[in-house]
């Protein structure tokens, strides 16, 4: 898939679903791909691929499962492949907003991993730049984008920091997008910011991202 990226500016909400339908059956572990919890039968989205001590993990939302749950990915032919087991899950919610919502799935077969965003800029795959923290996001107030298996790509203006440190921004998201990557973009570079956690039911374009910089730093994880 060659999904050409166009910079989105202003206060408008951008949404593109059709071009990202391949995320439903990607046959590989890539940001935004659908991952099915084999115990629950429900699905979320791959966030970022991280590494620690030579092992690779999917960083996704904690509410997508519990420790010990297996997750699978479907290929274009409809075959399901178990890709790993959740080794860490924490979810603390406050109404519609998760105070803390992070999970790690240990990847069984690193050969299935394509850690790059499936976006292209001027016919070159978009470069994943350095992870940025909440202070950077507050200073630059960039437009944020999220990818997920349910609704594809959506971008909108950054709104602010929630009471418990979550990042609030405007975009379109539905159940199934949870856990997917959230990033800022500039000139063909994507700056990882967080993962999709949820949204406000009474104000559906307000979305919630869990910041990831401190989690990665504290845990000794490196983004691939």
Which stretches of residues belong to each language-model region?
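Poly-acidic low-complexity segments
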Residues: 4, 99, 109, 192, ...
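Hydrophobic alpha-helical segments and their boundary regions
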Residues: 130, 168-169
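Terminal presequence/propeptide segments associated with secretion/organelle targeting
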Residues: 1-74, 150-152, 163-164, 170-171, ...
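Catalytic nucleophile loop of clan PA
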Residues: 172-195
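Active-site donor-binding loop signature of nucleotide-sugar glycosyltransferases
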Residues: 107, 197-198
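Serine endopeptidase catalytic core focused on the charge-relay Asp
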Residues: 29-163, 184
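Generic structural signal for well-ordered, non-membrane alpha-helical segments
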Residues: 98-100, 175, 205
């Amino acid at each position: 898939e060659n999904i050409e990226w166009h910079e989105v500016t202003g206060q408008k909400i951008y949404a593109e679903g059709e071009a990202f339908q391949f995320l439903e059956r990607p046959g590989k572990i890539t940001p935004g791909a659908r991952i099915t919890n084999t115990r629950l039968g429900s699905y979320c989205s791959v966030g970022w691929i991280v590494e620690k001590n030579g092992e690779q993990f999917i960083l996704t939302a904690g509410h997508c499962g519990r420790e010990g749950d297996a997750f699978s990915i479907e290929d274009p032919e409809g075959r399901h492949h178990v890709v790993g087991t959740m080794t860490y899950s924490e979810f603390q919610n406050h109404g519609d907003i998760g105070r803390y919502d992070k999970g790690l799935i240990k990847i069984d077969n690193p050969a299935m991993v394509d850690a790059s965003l499936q976006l292209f800029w001027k016919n070159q795959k978009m470069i994943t730049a350095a992870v940025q923290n909440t202070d950077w996001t507050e200073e630059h107030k960039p437009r944020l984008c999220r990818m997920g298996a349910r609704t594809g790509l959506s971008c909108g203006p950054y709104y602010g920091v929630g009471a418990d440190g979550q990042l609030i921004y405007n975009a379109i998201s539905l159940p199934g997008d949870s856990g997917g990557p959230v990033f800022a973009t500039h000139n063909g570079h994507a700056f990882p910011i967080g993962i999709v956690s949820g949204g406000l039911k009474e104000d559906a374009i307000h979305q919630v991202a869990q910041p990831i910089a401190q989690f990665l730093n504290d845990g000794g994880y490196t983004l691939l």
